[in-house]
Amino acid sequence: MADSETLALQQQAERLRGWRDGFQAVYVITTGVQTGFFDQLAAHPQGLTAEELAQRTACHAPYVAIWCGSAYRYQLLDTVNGRYVLAPHVDSLLVGRAHPDSQAVLFLNAVREAGPRLARQADYMHSGAVGSHAEAYGTNPTRLDPPPNQEALQQRLWQAEMQSRVPALAAALHNGGRVLDVGCGPGLMLLQLAASYPNATFVGVDVVEVGGLETARRLIRERGFDDRIHLECVPAEQMTYAEAFDGVLITRVFHEIPVASRVGLFRACYRALKRPGVLLNLDFAYPDTLAEFREPLFWSGVDNQYREMSWGTVHPTWQEQQQMLTAAGFAAIERHFVRHIPQGTHYLAVANKR
């Protein structure tokens, strides 16, 4: 075997080993979240020994020592004077779930929900069986009781990524405008907008009750927004609103809409908008070309497509989305990449009704 061939083989072998290591790192992180190890280390910035960490979490000391070594190996922990401390930014990313960049819940979901499903992918390949997002949402604790960072993320998405691209909509909201949130789920974007624009009113639609509208109703009632946020359980393509809204939001849900319903959904959104009005659709960036499958901008979409294919997820390409928006009547369609989301890069489509 030529040296170049040996090198190439070893490079590929190292890549595969890295993926195996990453798999184990997911479980090291999840264990640290579930046991409270990260929380305790954040509460003691001077550091803890493995024995002290075991005592404070009522865990088996020899196993905790092994966990600390593994977490140090993955650069989740550092040491100061022989005591373990959190590595930089781990407190924001894995502790105290109010930070918009927190990934603690994503790791929990990966182990509790995605892992078992991915272990059955070979069976799905043979059977072609399809589940549903609604079934999964009804058992997902982050949908039933959303962690604080999810609201913080919605606030940042609006303020940092959306608001500046639709100044006319922002002005309308200040002056008592009206917005429709399609696929509103537990209502987190609605809550943020209602708090930011006290003169505006909002409507949220979804087809998921448990883990969706049921949670939204509770949160809206608790925040005292009952008089300004109305919820409706209806498939979005069956909405009958006509020139009723200044803006329509679809936030990270379009890939879940059945393919046969997508043009109908955009047409219903177009009818629902006043003239002028604007639609904002934020979703995973998915490749148009084979070359884009190897571009990091699109990896979150590629990974999500594989992870959710047995739920019936079909990610649209940008070209497909443009064609659907145009067929629905929208004009001046723009795409903006949004990178600062814990789940990875998304894109924001801005489409206008003129």
How would you describe each model-predicted region?
Residues 19, 23, 31, 70-177:
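Conserved Class I S-adenosyl-L-methionine-dependent methyltransferase catalytic core
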Residues 186-198:
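Conserved SAM-binding loop of SAM-dependent methyltransferases across substrates and taxa
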Residues 263-275:
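A short glycine-rich, Lys/Arg-flanked "PGG" loop and its adjoining helix->strand segment in the class I
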Residues 237-248:
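A short acidic, Gly/Pro-enriched loop at the edge of an enzyme's catalytic core
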Residues 195-236:
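Class I SAM-dependent methyltransferase SAM/SAH-binding core
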Residues 328-354:
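Core SAM-dependent methyltransferase catalytic element
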Residues 282-328, 333-337:
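C-terminal alpha-helical "lid/dimerization" subdomain adjacent to the S-adenosyl-L-methionine
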Residues 175-185:
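Conserved class I S-adenosyl-L-methionine
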